[in-house]
């Protein structure tokens, strides 16, 4: 059997908005508002990029931009990589013995981005711009 990828993205749906000849669409996570388009993880959360902050941008395509700021300074675009979503990996690691189907588990996803902060106590802001020009922002304060 093939392993079934577990991804936060599975808990949502696409929303399409039509205005005359213009079409806008976005991913809607169940239980979250429209602006919740990505998850941001602190340094150390990702087993693939332990030295980096990681963003999982669920509906990403090549027209999107993923920028980051450290202490208010524009650091440019984050680097895309393939890896495990930290929350899904941790969930599977802790709970796999209780799964009814043993082929369920964390799988590699290709909509992850990373950036390595210069200092351990930085304020990090990530700005994601989608294909329609909508900007989504998340902030976190790194701890020492």
Spans of features found by a protein language model:
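Short, small-residue-biased leader/transition segments that mark boundaries at the very start
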Residues: 3-8
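Short, compositionally biased P/S/T/A/G/V-rich stretches that sit at domain boundaries
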Residues: 12-14, 19-51
């Amino acid at each position: 059997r093939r392993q079934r990828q577990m991804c936060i993205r599975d808990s949502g749906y696409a929303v399409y908005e039509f205005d005359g000849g213009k079409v806008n669409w976005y991913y809607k996570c169940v239980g979250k508002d429209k602006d919740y388009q990505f998850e941001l993880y602190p340094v150390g959360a990702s087993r693939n990029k332990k030295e980096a902050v990681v963003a999982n941008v669920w509906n990403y395509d090549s027209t999107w931009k993923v920028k980051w700021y450290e202490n208010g300074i524009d650091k440019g675009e984050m680097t895309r990589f393939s890896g495990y979503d930290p929350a899904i990996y941790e969930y599977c690691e802790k709970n796999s013995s209780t799964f009814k189907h043993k082929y369920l588990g964390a799988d590699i996803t290709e909509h992850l981005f990373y950036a390595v902060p210069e200092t351990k106590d930085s304020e990090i802001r990530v700005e994601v711009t989608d294909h329609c020009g909508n900007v989504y922002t998340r902030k976190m304060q790194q701890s020492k």
